[in-house]
Amino acid sequence: MRFAAAALLAWAGLSAALPAQPNIYAGTKVFRVPTGNQNQTDSIGRMIESLNLPTWTKARMAFSHIDVQVSKDRLNAFHAALKSVDSNLDNQVVTMHEDLGASILKEAEGMNSASVDPFAGLATDAWFNSYHSYADHLTFLNDLVATFPNNAKIVTSGTSYQGRTITGINIFGSSGSGTKPAIVFHGTVHAREWIATMVTEQVAYSLLSNYTTSATIKSYVDKYDFYIFPVVNPDGFVYTQTSDRLWRKNRQPTTSASCVGRDVNRNWAFKWDTPGGASAGDAPENKGLAAFLNARSSSAAGAKLFIDFHAYGLLFMGPYGYSCSAKAADQTEHNRLEQGFAAAFKAPYGKTLTTGPICTTIYQATGNSVDYAYDVSKFKYSFTPELRGSSSGNGFVLPPAEIRPSGIEVYEGIKYLLANMS
């Protein structure tokens, strides 16, 4: 494929920049801290906050866990604080990353040794052996179109703050593009969640590569228009590959020089709150993404399904996130599909998903894409998964060996939805 032809040059530049990333986190550890009853859970949370430690996940409930990142200069204080909460707690902590910088470097080595495909311009599943640069992701989408020209074309959904086009692929069937109800997939709105990029691309590749060989897949592609955007936060994604592997937000300045970026998934103009930016929908990425969703729902073909892919946590959730008491108008139907997706997802590798509304399943989240797509854009179904990284203990820095299994289990879940949506 063309990405391979350009890879030697692209990766030469990228690999030159990558060593700066592990140096940021050299000696940093990531721990999983088990929590007991609610009082202990709250105490651990306050302790972590007092030390100003970044958390990868928070305890969703009592008798859960908190994944926390601890730099080497805070290690002694962290262990002492654990003992102050409970004298036995320090012995129960699990180390997720002994040296986060080394883990990031290992992940980057996998990228730099990506397989070279001799078939220039053709998309193959060798792509899913490793992670890739942003430039190569764009090339891969173009390779998909070149490989499957009768069923795919490039689409865009606005631009980022730094001027990058938000690029996706439209997959369509025998009736042509734009004639069937829309299914829209977003990936990597949180820049550090690289697995979301690969999984959305694997779903796209699977739909296209099976169109002519599977009557079932052909029926799905003929029935719906798929719009798949693997990277909806391109500025943040590029920043994770050049400066800080664990960056989450976009790169839009704020009024504070020390606080850069909007959380694009708290910026949607529905039940928005101040942590999502200066005003609702003020991130350029959101403006373009919202306009694209609204255009699909206002078209004659209509809007069927929206999914915003995230990592990590092994969850599959629907509306609402803004309130734990609000219920979707078709809550029972959403619940049914969530549970069916989870069963299909579990079949290949035994990974169990927790399902339910966002707010009651993980935490309250205002200004999120799922609520917007469901309540404003009027997509019939709206979901968000949290993918792998929890049970393996790798979190956001997921080894390349987990890419393909992640895509396979998600694809099984997607096929369930396509077969069972009303």
Positions of PLM-derived features:
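M14 metallocarboxypeptidase catalytic domain recognition
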Residues: R2-A6, W11-S422
